[in-house]
């Protein structure tokens, strides 16, 4: 873990600049990955690789007129809220940038960020913020809760490998484990990565990305391969993936168009059910690979409960769900209302609904 990369060497609570190196005490967490500190001249410093409460040595990588950006080179005094995460890629992979921070501190930081935004940007008075901001509703799981992960291809020593975007988004970090992914499927990621690495040695798969969805409730496991249109070794890919990961569904999502505006052309079933199912809020949803669904099923249920509580829908009422997606709120509303009008422009989500 990243906590072991920077040994404790001394305690210093003041902030001073030494050439292009600075000694900083991190005051809070910002939106995104960075910790916030201030230089002696009062300029804000966004610090990569640090958490609130850390005292660090940091190298300035950008010095702007109103703020600076810096990269942690050494943790001098760790925050009492710093933890040893279960993932060895925290601080390298860009997927869990707060992984070194305790859950309690994460929740407090998110609430403080919201309060600060309402005051600074929304111009709400502190007493109004106190009334508006309620305690955070959250799930119990710190790790092992994600029902979906996505992998990006990269070339290592002339061979295609799969990984995740790094802290530097231009780089791909090759991984074969992710403690954020559903803990009921501990071998799924490694099996899929191994199978596709093997296939890439003898076939040009043209992979643009790979999606893996898992449900502990339905036991559904889907592997989605995003590729351009054209020829594809369907039988070999489906056979190797089935033997390695035993998914309930293997699909190929074909896309076309300019790189920054790719659109889904077709979803092709290679093996199994051709879709992914999840039980949620007293119902079941069936989703195709391109459709969006909250990556935290229990978190989605909390959102549904809050919305239903606020709306208090009645049997004789009509409801309109705008930007409804595949129906996360539409379906619970339909079980409570007389009629629901669902509005959505994205084709795959409309077909799923």
Residue ranges and their predicted role:
Residues 53, 181, 296:
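Short, conserved phosphate/pyrophosphate- and ester-handling motifs at nucleotide-, phospho-/glycolipid
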Residues 217-228, 284-288:
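Short, aliphatic-rich beta-strand segments
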Residues 147, 221, 316-317:
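Nucleotide donor/acceptor-binding cores
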Residues 57-59, 150, 320:
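Hydrophobic beta-strand signal
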Residues 73-85, 91-205, 217:
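Extended interfacial segments that mediate partner engagement and assembly in macromolecular machines
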Residues 2-3, 12-25, 31, 232-353:
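Rossmann-like S-adenosyl-L-methionine
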Residues 9-89, 119, 169:
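Terminal RNA-binding accessory module
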């Amino acid at each position: 873990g990243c906590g072991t990369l920077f040994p404790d060497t001394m305690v210093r609570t003041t902030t001073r600049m030494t050439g292009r190196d600075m000694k900083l005490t991190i005051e809070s967490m910002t939106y995104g990955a960075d910790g916030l500190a201030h230089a002696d001249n009062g300029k804000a410093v966004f610090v990569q690789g640090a958490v609130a409460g850390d005292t660090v040595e940091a190298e300035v990588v950008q010095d702007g007129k109103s703020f600076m950006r810096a990269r942690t080179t050494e943790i001098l005094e760790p925050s009492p809220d710093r933890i040893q995460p279960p993932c060895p890629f925290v601080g390298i992979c860009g997927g869990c940038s707060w992984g070194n921070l305790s859950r309690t501190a994460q929740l407090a930081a998110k609430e403080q960020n919201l309060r600060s935004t309402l005051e600074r940007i929304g111009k709400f008075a502190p007493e109004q913020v106190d009334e508006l901001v309620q305690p955070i509703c959250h799930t119990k799981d710190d790790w092992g809760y994600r029902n979906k992960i996505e992998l990006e291809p990269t070339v290592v020593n002339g061979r295609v490998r799969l990984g995740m975007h790094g802290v530097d988004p231009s780089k791909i970090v090759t991984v074969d484990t992710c403690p954020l992914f559903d803990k009921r499927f501990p071998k799924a990621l490694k099996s899929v990565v191994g199978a596709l690495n093997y296939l890439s040695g003898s076939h040009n798969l043209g992979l643009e990305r790979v999606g893996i969805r898992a449900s502990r409730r339905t036991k559904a496991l889907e592997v989605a391969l995003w590729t351009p249109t054209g020829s594809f070794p369907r039988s070999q890919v489906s056979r190797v993936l089935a033997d390695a990961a035993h998914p309930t569904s293997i699909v190929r999502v074909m896309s076309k168009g300019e790189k920054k505006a790719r659109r889904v052309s077709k979803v092709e079933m290679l093996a199994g059910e051709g879709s992914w199912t999840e039980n949620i809020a007293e119902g079941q949803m069936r989703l195709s690979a391109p459709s969006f669904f909250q990556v935290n099923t229990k978190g989605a249920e909390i959102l549904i409960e809050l919305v239903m509580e606020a709306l208090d829908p009645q049997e004789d009422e009509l409801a309109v769900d705008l930007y409804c997606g595949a129906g996360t709120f539409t379906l619970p509303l339909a079980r409570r209302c007389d009629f629901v009008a669902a509005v959505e422009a994205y084709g795959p989500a409309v077909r799923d609904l």
